[in-house]
Structure formats: C-alpha cells, structure tokens
C-alpha cells in the first residue's frame, strides 16, 4: 500500500482517514465541485476538480435492498462486506444522477440459516456461502418449489437464492 500512497502524493491527491463523505457539492450548473465530509473534528468542505465515487454497492443496506430487490431482502444475510451501504449511490442520486443499469438483480445464494449476518471474510467451510446441497429443496411447509435438476448447479444457485428468499420464513 505504500506504493499507492506514494503515487497519490505524487499526483497531488490528499488521502484522509476517518473522513466520511456525506454530500456532494455542486455549482449552479449542477457540476460536482467537491464534497462535504464529517471527521472527528467536525464537518469540512473539500473543493475538488473531480470526485471519484468508489463506495461499493448497497448490499449492506437493508432499506435499499428492499427498495430495489423487493420484499424480504431486508432480512437477507450479506455474503460480503457490511460496509457497502449505498452512501455513494445516494449522494449521486441526491444531486441529480440518473439510476442506470439493472438495480433489481443481484448475486444471491442460499446460505446456512445460522450463518452470521455479514460475511466472515475468512475462507472456510463453516457456512457454505456459495451453494446448496444436492437433493430436493422444500420450504417450511414441506412444499417443493424449484426444479433442482433444471440445469447444472453453476447455472441455478443464484436463481435459487432469489427463489428461497421468497419462501415462508425465507427458508428451505
């Protein structure tokens, strides 16, 4: 990481820690001119010729998951990081950016009901986060709700994740 800091310093980029961006600033024409940040010392305005929003998606935000993915998604466990809260997306939308792309789709997989709410960021087999067991899947009512043999597992596991979350108690 030292090389990245050196490259940033050489390019005149100021790297800050404990500075949470809270709002994009714009001029009268709507061009982004900087941002507002919150630090332990208070709020600060940073003027900039360019702002890069590299803040991840909204997978760690239950409200945004429900808004864009649908019912029951606020209850989904997050396979990855809890820090992708959609703040960068929200800031862009707040200043007039247009949502573009496929917001109603996601990479969803079945996951152990007792797994942690967010990914443990360790590789291991404690909780299988990428698959489902071979066999029949039934919901809590004992009803079969998918054709487990519709295709190879690599082509069905994401599709089945969305199907499971629509079942009673989002459980199979």
Could you tell me what each predicted segment is?
Residues 1-49, 89, 95:
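Helical element adjacent to the flavin cofactor pocket in flavoenzyme catalytic cores
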Residues 39-40, 80, 123, 130:
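Generic detector of short alpha-helix boundary/capping microenvironments
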Residues 89-172:
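An anion/pyrophosphate-binding glycine-rich loop and adjacent beta-alpha core
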Residues 38-39, 46-116, 156:
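Glycine-rich loop(s) and the adjacent beta-strand/alpha-helix scaffold that form part
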Residues 1-23, 63, 71, 135-144, ...:
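Conserved N-terminal/central alpha/beta ligand/cofactor-binding core
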Residues 27-30, 52, 64, 70, ...:
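A generic structural micro-environment signature
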Residues 18-20, 35-40, 49-50, 54-58, ...:
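Fold-independent oxyanion-binding glycine-rich loops
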């Amino acid at each position: 990481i030292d090389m990245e800091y050196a490259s940033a310093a050489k390019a005149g980029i100021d790297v800050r820690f404990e500075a949470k961006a809270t709002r994009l600033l714009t001029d009268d024409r709507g061009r982004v001119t900087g941002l507002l940040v919150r630090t332990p010392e208070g709020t600060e305005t940073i003027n900039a010729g360019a702002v890069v929003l590299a803040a991840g998606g909204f997978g760690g935000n239950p409200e945004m998951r429900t808004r864009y993915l649908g019912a029951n998604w606020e209850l989904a466990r997050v396979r990855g990081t809890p820090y992708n809260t959609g703040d960068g997306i929200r800031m862009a939308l707040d200043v007039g950016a247009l949502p573009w792309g496929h917001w109603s789709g996601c990479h969803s997989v079945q996951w152990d009901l007792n797994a942690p709410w967010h990914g443990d960021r360790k590789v291991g087999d404690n909780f299988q986060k990428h698959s489902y067991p071979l066999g029949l899947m039934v919901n809590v009512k004992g009803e079969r709700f998918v054709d487990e043999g519709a295709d190879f597992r690599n082509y069905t596991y994401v599709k089945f994740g969305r199907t499971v979350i629509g079942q009673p108690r989002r459980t199979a």
